[in-house]
Amino acid sequence: MMARPVLFVLAGVNGAGKSSIGGHLLQQAGLSWFNPDTFARELMAATGCGQDEANAAAWQEGVRRFDAAMAERSHHAIETTLGGRTIPARIMAATRTHDVMVWFCGLATPELHIARVKARVRAGGHDIPEASIRARYPLAQANLIALMPQIAHLQVYDNSVEVAPGQVVPDPVLVAEMIAGSLVWPVDVDTLRATPEWAKPLLEAAISLQAGGMAASE
């Protein structure tokens, strides 16, 4: 039997650092991905259009490329907040034809996401309305939990640590990993107790999913 194509998903609310984390992993694997922020920025520079128009065009282009890759049954990589409806629904549909691998990056609070986005704006990046970030924060987790039973491989990272300017930025902390519905990290009680508050609903969902799978196999 031929191996199924893979859909790589870099997920997390704006400001989480998903591009830095997942992008590095994809580059190590020799893969590229559609980054809507980069697309929007390049479109604005090339055409002089406004931020809203560029964001809309980037979103539409991302959906177009996604749909084309799914139809062709080819490998694909995307970046998403998971805080909407359209992309999570498409990812769910893709699990029928693709092995879906998700790297989800989160921060302790919506306020920290907002602060990171503001810092990015000061460095020349584009802004995201605070209301959008606050709305996406709970939706992203809810959508991830809904996808969990169908995800082939999931890694959840905490990227909340703050450092002073000029200091070395620490690597994000792996707080959960699932492979085919089985929780493989954390592996001990002490590590489980160290789970950050924001990620506990995800761990609880993963543990519940695994327990349900074990009960069904008995």
Q: Where do the PLM segments sit?
A:
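Phosphate-binding P-loop
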Residues: M1-R4, A69-M70
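Conserved substrate/cofactor phosphate-moiety recognition/catalytic segment
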Residues: S20-S74
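Short hydrophobic/aromatic beta-strand immediately N-terminal to the Walker A/P-loop
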Residues: L7-V9
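Glycine-rich phosphate-binding loop used to anchor ATP phosphates in small-molecule kinases
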Residues: A57-C105, A140, Q155
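A glycine- and Lys/Arg-enriched "phosphate-lid" helix/loop adjacent to the NTP-binding pocket
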Residues: H98-L144
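Conserved glycine(s) of the Walker
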Residues: G17
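P-loop (Walker A) phosphate-binding loop of NTP-binding proteins
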Residues: V13
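NTP-dependent small-molecule kinase module
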Residues: L147-E218
